[in-house]
Amino acid sequence: MKGCIFNIDAGYLEGLCRGFKCGILKQSDYLNLVQCETLEDLKLHLQGTDYGTFLANEPSPLSVSTIDDKLREKLVIEFQHLRNHSVEPLSTFLDFITYSYMIDNIILLITGTLHQRPISELIPKCHPLGSFEQMEAIHVAATPAELYNAVLVDTPLAPFFVDCISEQDLDEMNIEIIRNTLYKAYLEAFYDFCKQIGGTTADVMCEILAFEADRRAIIITINSFGTELSKDDRAKLYPRCGKLNPDGLAALARADDYEQVKAVAEYYAEYSALFEGAGNNVGDKTLEDKFFEHEVNLNVHAFLQQFHFGVFYSYLKLKEQECRNIVWISECVAQKHRAKIDNYIPIF
């Protein structure tokens, strides 16, 4: 019965999304791509996939940045098509997905402005899914309070910004604190919204968002070593909707080095496994790569269940990983640096 009700409003879009997912590159496609000698070869191989002629109008010689832009453009068109045909509560769910891109755009613009880069040069670098009308006014803000009052007060990010408002000048450290505070509030709000929807959507999305929250807490901790950020301030940046909450986060807040972070992870089976295989030696996978691999697994598993919104989130994340893979391979081909060309993260 629940499936019938779900299908009234969201069944067509879920089916469409699953159709899009069938076009994600397989391992056999990657084996062809890594054998390419030039970007023109790569373009030719991509024509035999669901990407088709997306590079057909691009003049030679192709650049990696052009490939990156066209990959993003194709993904944005697909996502916006889903958003334009959605109704509540799916439309709000899809809007929530775009808020993370809005946060990234704001941080990019503030950082660029801090380094005296013209706003006209920064706007094209912003992600289209996170664009909003007030973006071009961001250069007038010198403090977080001004940023809120001049730019963010009328955007969906306003509720997330409440804990960031201060009269301190915007510098590198404050910008990072703002980024992480916004993400904390965003993840917690998205998690609560998914729980409110309930059912399979809550089961799938809360698992994915809990991992995202824990990943951010671990990375914030590791990146804070050797900086001026105090342990108390660091603890305030941890999202509280992950599996590490509360004991794991309390232990992370006390950590003084990487080994202590690893010791915290050992109490959580899925995170312990990620640290076990990670390293910075030649041939080792980085912790970041291990996190990406785990994220891919969670998002692939989202498609094993039906009648839920998680497939929309997971499709976007899997396609983003695919775009990173293609850009990585393109960079290696363009620079004739084939030693690390296999360091992409396979999806299927």
Swiss-Prot record:
Listed InterPro entries: ATPase_csu/dsu_sf, ATPase_V0-cplx_csu/dsu, ATPase_V0-cplx_dsu, V-type_ATPase_csu/dsu, V-type_ATPase_csu/dsu_dom_3
GO molecular function, one term: proton-transporting ATPase activity, rotational mechanism
Disulfide bond sites: none
Keywords: Hydrogen ion transport, Ion transport, Transport
GO cellular component: proton-transporting V-type ATPase, V0 domain
Annotated SUPFAM superfamilies: V-type ATP synthase subunit C
Keyword Ion transport: yes
Superkingdom to which the source organism belongs: Eukaryota
UniProt entry tagged with the keyword Ion transport: yes
Role: Subunit of the V0 complex of vacuolar(H+)-ATPase (V-ATPase), a multisubunit enzyme composed of a peripheral complex (V1) that hydrolyzes ATP and a membrane integral complex (V0) that translocates protons. V-ATPase is responsible for acidifying a variety of intracellular compartments in eukaryotic cells, thus providing most of the energy required for transport processes in the vacuolar system. May play a role in coupling of proton transport and ATP hydrolysis.
Family: Belongs to the V-ATPase V0D/AC39 subunit family.
Oligomeric form and interacting partners: V-ATPase is a heteromultimeric enzyme made up of two complexes: the ATP-hydrolytic V1 complex and the proton translocation V0 complex. The V1 complex consists of three catalytic AB heterodimers that form a heterohexamer, three peripheral stalks each consisting of EG heterodimers, one central rotor including subunits D and F, and the regulatory subunits C and H. The proton translocation complex V0 consists of the proton transport subunit a, a ring of proteolipid subunits c9c'', rotary subunit d, subunits e and f, and the accessory subunits VhaAC45 and ATP6AP2.
Protein known as: V-type proton ATPase subunit d
